[in-house]
Amino acid sequence: MAVTECEWASLGSRIGLRAALVLLSGSLLVVLFPLSGLEHQYRTALNILLQCNLWGGDDRHTFTGQTRGLAVASTAIELLVLKQKPTSDVKFEAKAALNQALEMKRQGKKEKAHKLLHHALKMDPDHVDALNELGILLEEEKDIIQADYLYSKALTISPHNEKALINRDRTLPLVEEIDQRYFSLIDSKVKKLMSIPKGNPALRRVMEESYYHHIYHTVAIEGNTLSLSEIRHIIETRYAVPGKSLEEQNEVIGMHAAMKYVNATLVSRIGSVTIDNILEIHRRILGYVDPVEAGRFRRNQVFVGHHIPPHPRDVEKLMQEFVQWLNSEEAMSLHPVEFAALAHYKLVYIHPFVDGNGRTSRLLMNLILMQAGYPPITVRKEQRSEYYHVLEIANEGDVRPFIRFIAKCTESTLDLLLIATAEHPVGLPEPNHGFSECKQTITIKT
């Protein structure tokens, strides 16, 4: 599928960083915090510094990222989460709620049992028995994917738990089959889209519109206040919008430059993806906002919510391993959506840059999709919470929900393109706060 500059979809997220000064052990340290983080994340990172020797020692895990297939949880995750462990009284309450839930289930009152199990896990999120019992209840309700997720979480907490192992062995093949069927559905929609002539006027219009929507949602997720029409004005005229932040407008110009580079230079190129390619993408993304840091690896430790990315001295080695994986037969053998999602996650996990990691990861993801004949995908700003939630789940050890999220976004993008090129086409939905996600799907006749 030939790709023009306009064949971009909307997606966006960035994890930016701001300097904050922290007094620790009589020394003044500079610590970088996420721009998009909430106030409690600042406090969390500060507490981590006060409670552990973050800078000392070599006893650290580094991400080797050997994930194989959608149904396999990611391993070797370097995650430092400051969780308040439940007190003995809270654990007792969770146990009591679990016992009461089992009694309600025995009496056939499944709705009450469901609520009690949720209450038990709210009290004690790592209660393995409650995770197992809620999973069994969800299995009975035919929610196999969520049940399998709960069993996987139980095994993350207690790897040798016999009940969780038995439950997971039962759901795993079913989940694999569900995932593969969904990939097949996406493939059928890609095939239908590719059957539309390249010169189709409706397709050209919607691709052009999706280009601007991509930039709009990418920067809006980060708090950028520019409207879709203002972004179009900046890109088309290169003139500033009066009364708007120049930094916000430079973010738009940087995204435009990076997308043009990927589309014109990398999509149709034959050969391996290199570290230099990734650095060039980042140099354009950040070049108009922070030219000093643009296109080079970070030299400071950073915090991303509860996640502590690898130490800066490990970044270059991890990036070499990442690029080696990108070009490996193992990665190439994956379904394109799974490959693209894993590439996104692995890069954003390493977090090699001071800023712009999310945007770089998403552009790399779309590069992989386009090279496989898929359209670049749309993730709207209204999906921001879900997007970060599944990334957090991946950091906890299960990358499958993130892959499914990317698959859902891929299908939504395909649906929009197919709807727009139907007999009675409609345009892309206008940005608004009430739009959550595109839930409509198109039945493919075989």
Curated annotation (Swiss-Prot):
Active site: residue positions: 351
GO biological process per UniProt: protein adenylylation; protein deadenylylation; regulation of IRE1-mediated unfolded protein response; response to endoplasmic reticulum stress; response to unfolded protein
Cofactor note: Divalent metal cation. Prefers Mn(2+) over Mg(2+).
Pfam families listed in its UniProt record: Fic (PF02661)
Subcellular location: Endoplasmic reticulum membrane
Biological role: Protein that can both mediate the addition of adenosine 5'-monophosphate (AMP) to specific residues of target proteins (AMPylation), and the removal of the same modification from target proteins (de-AMPylation), depending on the context. The side chain of Glu-222 determines which of the two opposing activities (AMPylase or de-AMPylase) will take place. Acts as a key regulator of the ERN1/IRE1-mediated unfolded protein response (UPR) by mediating AMPylation or de-AMPylation of HSPA5/BiP.
Protein's UniProt name: Protein adenylyltransferase FICD
Organism: Xenopus tropicalis (Western clawed frog)
Species lineage: Eukaryota, Metazoa, Chordata, Craniata, Vertebrata
